[in-house]
């Protein structure tokens, strides 16, 4: 009986050659590119007179720098316009499929690839973006890469990588009402730390994971990188197959039946050997909010901000830095902290089900006075589906702004930015200093439903109090 994990199986299937020094040349099945990390890579190709090795395995979109109010061209920001134009020209020159604004397929790269069926089990996927691990939710091995590696994949369709160890994170029980996938992954990162996963791939498994939708699973894998892991994945199952069936790039007819048989064979063997394993009880997890300046600095909504003495010595210095930057007192409650801005969106939580959960809280309520709240769908398809359900109307009646697709305030490489020392409740993935556009801006990460709760109450609020 095989003792291989899914990671082992996919690695072996995509191994091209061994490289002196311990690295492996790995074939990349799908390469996703965008406007920020691709220009220099294309320039390097052009300088050497090289062409893209597998344009049919390369897909482009624009997401990081696009404005979310009006997306009429040219963009007011000349640099953003130049970056988009450069991507358009590079895609045209190298015959790369480009999901442009208005195509119906444009959006955040980690939202559009799954929803179009491009992301499939058994693939190796690379993208010049940290949160490429999102695609591991489908039983693929997905890596974020740097610009020089984007160049390498464009030129050779391969990457030089060292094989990771595999850590299984098992979840017994099930999430309680008002607790979501975002709470689960924030809880894991808080317990294990932001460096626990260095050198590892995380395999997420157990009854709690089995019970999640694909969109919830994507949230989990999206933030594996925040725990230090190079990638995170979930074994493919019926939930995976049901999600993929009928999508534009999914296999059709007899090929679909063949694909399912193959995908099922990729799941980690029952006798698989892991390098490490840890267990959690999902039923004990509460709505979770970050209080500091790393995704690992989080607490349950009904808990108090930790005191330095209660922390491990290795965590005390960053905690002292966080208290000062966030202007929060150790021992104080996270609930009740006033909020200036509420952002719902990102590759972590900008999908239809995320917006549905937030809309449930916003419905028949009003955004609190003095709070700016806005919703940014993760893609044009998400926006279209949400609008067909009337979610845009629910949000707008409540006082939220309904925006156009893009990365938006997750990273503030576009007009959506915090000002001065504003505090934001955000459904994104990083709360680093200055992450949302202001050197003094403060970010508290939470689920979309929790963001909506903060918007209508004006402060951090336990969403369970607002559920019908």
Swiss-Prot record:
Binding site for [4Fe-4S] cluster: 347, 407, 410
Entry keyword Iron: yes
First-level EC class: lyase
Keywords for this protein: 4Fe-4S, Amino-acid biosynthesis, Branched-chain amino acid biosynthesis, Iron, Iron-sulfur, Leucine biosynthesis, Lyase, Metal-binding
Keyword Transcription regulation applies: no
EC numbers on record: 4.2.1.33
InterPro entries recorded: 3-IsopropMal_deHydase_lsu, Acnase/IPM_dHydase_lsu_aba_1/3, Acoase/IPM_deHydtase_lsu_aba, Aconitase_4Fe-4S_BS, Aconitase_4Fe-4S_dom, IPM_dehydratase_rel_enz, IPMI_cat
Catalytic activity: (2R,3S)-3-isopropylmalate = (2S)-2-isopropylmalate
Cofactor: [4Fe-4S] cluster
Family label: Belongs to the aconitase/IPM isomerase family. LeuC type 1 subfamily.
Function: Catalyzes the isomerization between 2-isopropylmalate and 3-isopropylmalate, via the formation of 2-isopropylmaleate.
Oligomeric form and interacting partners: Heterodimer of LeuC and LeuD.
PANTHER family according to UniProt: 3-ISOPROPYLMALATE DEHYDRATASE (PTHR43822:SF9), HOMOACONITASE, MITOCHONDRIAL-RELATED (PTHR43822)
Stored NCBIfam families: leuC, PRK05478.1, PRK12466.1
Record's protein name: 3-isopropylmalate dehydratase large subunit
Species in which this protein is naturally found: Prochlorococcus marinus (strain SARG / CCMP1375 / SS120)
Taxonomy of the source species: Bacteria, Bacillati, Cyanobacteriota, Cyanophyceae, Synechococcales
């Amino acid at each position: 009986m095989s003792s291989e994990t899914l990671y082992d199986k996919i690695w072996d299937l995509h191994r091209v050659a061994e490289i002196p020094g311990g690295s492996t040349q790995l074939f990349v099945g799908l390469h996703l590119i965008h406007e920020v990390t691709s220009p220099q890579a294309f320039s390097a190709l052009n300088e050497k007179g090289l062409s893209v090795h597998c344009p049919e395995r390369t897909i482009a979109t624009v997401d990081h720098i696009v404005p979310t109010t009006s997306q009429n061209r040219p963009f007011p920001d000349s640099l953003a316009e130049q970056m988009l134009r450069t991507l358009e020209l590079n895609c045209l020159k190298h015959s790369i499929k480009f999901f442009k604004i208005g195509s119906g397929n444009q959006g955040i790269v980690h939202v559009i690839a799954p929803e179009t069926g491009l992301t499939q089990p058994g693939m190796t996927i690379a993208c010049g973006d940290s949160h490429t691990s999102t695609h591991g939710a489908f039983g693929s091995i997905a890596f974020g890469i740097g610009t020089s590696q984007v160049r390498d994949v464009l030129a050779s369709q391969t990457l030089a990588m060292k094989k990771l160890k595999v850590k299984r994170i098992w979840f017994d029980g099930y999430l309680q009402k008002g607790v979501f996938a975002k709470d689960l992954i924030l809880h894991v990162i808080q317990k294990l730390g932001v460096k626990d996963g260095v050198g590892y791939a995380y395999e997420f498994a157990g009854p709690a994971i089995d019970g999640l939708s694909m969109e919830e699973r994507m949230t989990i894998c999206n933030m594996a990188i925040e725990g230090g892991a190079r990638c995170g994945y979930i074994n493919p199952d019926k939930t995976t197959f049901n999600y993929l069936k009928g999508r534009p790039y999914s296999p059709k007819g007899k090929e679909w039946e063949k694909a399912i048989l193959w995908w099922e064979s990729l799941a980690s063997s029952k006798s698989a050997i892991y390098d490490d394993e840890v267990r959690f009880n999902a039923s004990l997890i509460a709505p979770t909010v970050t209080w500091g300046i790393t995704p690992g600095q989080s607490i349950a909504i009904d808990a108090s901000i930790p005191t330095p003495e209660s922390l491990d010595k290795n965590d005390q210095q960053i905690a002292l830095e966080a208290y000062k930057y966030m202007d929060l007192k150790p021992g104080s409650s996270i609930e009740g902290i006033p909020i200036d801005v509420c952002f719902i969106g990102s590759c972590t939580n900008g999908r239809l089900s995320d917006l549905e959960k937030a809309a449930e809280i916003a419905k028949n309520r009003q955004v609190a006075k003095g709070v700016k709240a806005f919703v940014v769908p993760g893609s044009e398809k998400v926006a279209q589906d949400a609008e067909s359900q009337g979610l845009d109307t629910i949000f707008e009646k409540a006082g939220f702004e309904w925006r156009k697709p893009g990365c938006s305030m997750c990273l503030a490489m576009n007009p959506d930015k915090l000002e001065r020392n504003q505090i934001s409740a955000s459904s994104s993935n990083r709360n680093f200093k200055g992450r949302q556009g202001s050197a003094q801006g403060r970010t508290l990460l939470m689920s979309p439903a929790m963001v909506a709760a903060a918007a209508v109450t004006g402060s951090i609020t336990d969403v369970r109090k607002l559920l019908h």
